[in-house]
Amino acid sequence: MRESAGRYRPPVRPRQPAVRRKHSRLAVDVVASPGLRAPGLGAWLSSLAPVRARGAVTVAVVSDARVRALNHRYRRKPLVTDVLSFPSEDPGYLGDIVIAAGVARRQARQAGHSLQTELRVLALHGLLHLLGYDHERDNGRMARIEARLRSRGGLREGLIERHR
């Protein structure tokens, strides 16, 4: 798929079928740039998804340059960021979560944990944005939900806490 007429299109096509956990209503496709692996990320995110997370989502782990270009095009910010979320208008498809691989590596080093842990932190944060939460405007609601899910998923720190 390609970007066209100002509408977002996923940066890469999923190569494997979506992972849907036995008790989850969320199917997660994970696609990563060549040379990068994200084992278990889809199953982990699906297992933690809030009840209202129904349908499918794609998590794409791409280059910093790709994220910078997407951030500039869709948010008018010519900077690389760690994670972007692109909600879908299709009721069966929540949207896309795009993670900058280089930023994730650097943040993992700074936080003292693995890249896989950082990918989980970023994917969870992106999923909550796809569900409509906005930590800049919701008086801590997203932070509380993220903290609860993070704890359930074995993560000690989330993205919102880091930036406070």
Predicted regions and their residues:
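An acidic/histidine-cluster motif and surrounding catalytic segment
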Residues: M1-L119, L128-R164
